[in-house]
Amino acid sequence: MSAGDHERNDAWQRAVRAQFPIIAAHPELAYLDSAATSQKPQAVLDAVHTYLTSSNANAGRGTYPWANRTTEAVERARRRVAQFLGDPAPGHSTVHLTSGTTEGLRSVARDWLTGYLTDGDEILVPYADHRANLAPWLEAQDLLAARGVHVRVRPLPYQEASGDYDHRALSSVVGPRTRFVAATHVHHVYGGDMNVHRLRAAVGPDVPICLDAAQSVGHLPLRLDDPALDVDFVVFSGHKAFALPGTGAVWARNTRGPALRVGGWQGTPNTVGAVSLTAALDWLDTLGVDRVNAHVSALTTRLTDQLRHLPAYDVLGCPASLASSTELPTAQRRHGIVTFRHRDIRSDDLGFILYSHGFMVRADSLCQAGVDDTGGKDGSVRVSLHVYNTENEIDRLLAVLASLE
């Protein structure tokens, strides 16, 4: 990058950072926990304030102007999600607003999968990803068993060293009764792109795939109109993509198997959350997700390149050996998440030390399926980045980590 390009990038980054009031108000702190939740730009806060002070009402329960505007706001959020994701099947697809990824995955499991599977069917699910992408499928298995329908849940093969799915081993677990696959787009611990586009070739053209996109929406240019991303459900959390807590969505293609129909009386929707979700996606489109991805990827590379030279730390997933293999280089495979352990300091203790220096990180088992120890050998420290983070924050973090060698 030339000096001029560097100056322009710095100016862009300062302008973006200034749009986050909580970040601007605390320059002494570095928020490095965006995989847990994102901070909110002024545009989202303004949209919420405008709605609450001009047309706050219930949706679908009145004919007066405030109620009509609220109903339209909820419908607009659904349309905005479909547009943002590049909906390739607008004549068939549906968008259901949820409280987040966990509820969204449960909805697919409870409201769709339990009506789709028959006795003897098999499903492939990730046993080494976030617990929210495992528990709903096991719960669905139990619900079906109570009805006398017995299905087999098989682990999606993965490579322990990298955290990536073992695409070569998929052929050994895919069979004639494979009816459904659940997968993760970007791993919440390792930050790796899980190469989900390769799943379709392995499972065939007729098996529905559900994608947990909690760590990719808002980070990567996820476009469902790209034939390489041929999935049937996309589930994500709005609060990780600059919207308010308690927001999320399920996009359903509805061309493989029955249409997703969320069961039961829905009650009052999260109208404020819907307004915030639309505003957040508008803001992201204006900023440019490609630009966000480039900025965060550069910071991720800066951190991983230096952290690997500190002998006291073990970086989890995406090992350096991949950089010289036929796979994508390590730095390109990480998307804003770097997780590590100190060889002598417990992860929870390291988290406290880092906060004493102004760094807010996640330090525990990270909700990873099969990991229960929150602070000992199975615990880890996760640094997760977003558009408001800076090179200076990365360099200061590295200096503190180096001092603990």
Regions found by a protein language model. Give the residues of each.
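Pyridoxal 5′-phosphate
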Residues: 1-405
